[in-house]
């Protein structure tokens, strides 16, 4: 039986796409070829002397081979990026996201397509509050389902989780 495990963003603090392979032994011992793992994880891109960090949704097989990844397009101001960062860092406001610089925006949203071991699925990847932009994201309806990963625990007992669920 095929099983997709979906874990929220931030579930593995301090572990990025490049570091998750350090845990390959754990996944190989507890997951099998019928399992896929979808999780929120930080990723980075290095081009020349510029490092960009992304809030990403990544899909792995049971051996932690990266099958596909999506970088969040719509970032939360003051939560994932610091507006006017170049000005505000001069007064001490430099980092907001686990001591990284601001996250960078992903460049595009593509349907994630997985074709592996008799498994074929297509889903629309969303991270957290991107679901509220549904008018803009449903232009391409060539997917089987939506996976929206979110870590709403920081909302506490506020109205935030209820508002998020409505969308």
Which role does the model predict for each range below?
Residues 4-167:
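Solvent-exposed soluble domains appended to multi-pass membrane proteins
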């Amino acid at each position: 039986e095929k099983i997709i495990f979906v874990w929220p963003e931030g579930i593995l603090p301090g572990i990025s796409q490049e570091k998750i392979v350090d845990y390959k032994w754990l996944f190989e011992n507890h997951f099998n070829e019928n399992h896929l793992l979808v999780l929120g994880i930080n990723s980075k891109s290095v081009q020349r002397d510029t490092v960009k960090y992304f809030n990403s949704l990544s899909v792995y097989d049971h051996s932690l081979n990266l099958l596909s990844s999506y970088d969040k397009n719509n970032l939360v101001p003051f939560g994932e990026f610091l507006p006017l960062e170049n000005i505000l860092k001069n007064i001490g406001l430099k980092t907001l996201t686990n001591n990284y610089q601001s996250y960078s925006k992903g460049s595009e949203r593509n349907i994630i397509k997985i074709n592996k071991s008799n498994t074929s699925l297509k889903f629309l990847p969303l991270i957290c509050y991107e679901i509220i932009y549904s008018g803009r994201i449903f232009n391409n309806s060539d997917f089987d389902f939506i996976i929206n990963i979110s870590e709403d625990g920081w909302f506490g007992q506020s109205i935030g989780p209820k508002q998020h669920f409505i969308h």
